[in-house]
């Protein structure tokens, strides 16, 4: 069943940006490169099936207080190549790009209004970082009543334990549907 812009489903691709994906990037997340092939296939499938594909992208001002407060190096500074979606996953006509300045794709953005405007109630979240922007976007999606799914094949974390913790929190606390890789178990409740 095709749902797309008139229907019920969206694929939300979070922060698959040059400054997170490229080797040597300011905030490199090496695991992002491991998920690229599967995520590329998932994006193609979403487009083919009529799902709305939304890219939620970190976009900081050069003097963003997050850098000093959190100790992050400057990254995804608006207008720089580092803030662009990695070329192999580049948005296509019909896809939507939403810029964010915080960890959540919903906080201070138009994402909720965009999704509601398209009648979308079901989201699959993909991208990075599992224990930061995926977790906080999933939390806000759940609090807004979306049916959210996170498939472990399409998300990357900074460290295996933080990645696993975030998946457990999304599933056990937020009610997000988490699709585990083979051999991985859901947390006990």
Q: Model-flagged regions — what are they?
A:
Residues 14, 57, 152:
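Active-site flanking residues adjacent to catalytic metal/cofactor-binding acidic residues
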Residues 7, 25-58:
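A short alpha/beta connector and helix-capping loop motif
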Residues 64-69:
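Metal-dependent catalytic neighborhoods of phosphoester/phosphodiester hydrolases
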Residues 59-62, 155-156:
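Solvent-exposed loop/turn segments at secondary-structure junctions
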Residues 57-59, 128-129:
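Short, well-ordered beta-to-alpha junction loops that form the rim of enzyme active sites
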Residues 1-10, 38-49, 73-189:
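Active-site-adjacent betaalpha module
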Residues 18, 22:
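Short, glycine/acidic-enriched loop or turn micro-motifs at the edges of active sites
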Residues 10-17:
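Acidic-leg catalytic submotif of subtilisin-like serine proteases
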């Amino acid at each position: 069943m095709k749902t797309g812009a008139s229907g019920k489903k969206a694929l939300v691709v979070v922060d698959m940006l040059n400054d997170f994906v490229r080797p040597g990037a300011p905030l490199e997340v090496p695991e992002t490169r491991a998920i690229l092939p599967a995520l590329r296939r998932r994006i193609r499938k979403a487009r083919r099936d009529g799902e709305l594909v939304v890219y939620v992208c970190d976009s900081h001002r050069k003097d963003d207080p997050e850098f000093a407060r959190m100790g992050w190096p400057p990254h995804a500074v608006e207008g720089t190549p580092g803030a662009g979606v990695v070329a192999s996953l580049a948005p296509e006509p019909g896809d939507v790009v939403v810029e964010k300045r915080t960890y959540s794709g919903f906080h201070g953005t138009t994402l909720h209004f965009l999704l509601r405007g398209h009648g979308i109630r079901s989201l699959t979240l993909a991208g990075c970082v599992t224990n930061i922007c995926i977790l906080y976007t999933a939390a806000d999606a759940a609090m807004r009543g979306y049916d959210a799914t996170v498939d472990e094949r399409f998300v990357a974390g900074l460290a295996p334990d933080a990645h696993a913790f975030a998946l457990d929190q999304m599933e056990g606390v937020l009610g997000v549907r988490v699709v585990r890789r083979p051999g991985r178990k859901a947390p006990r409740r």
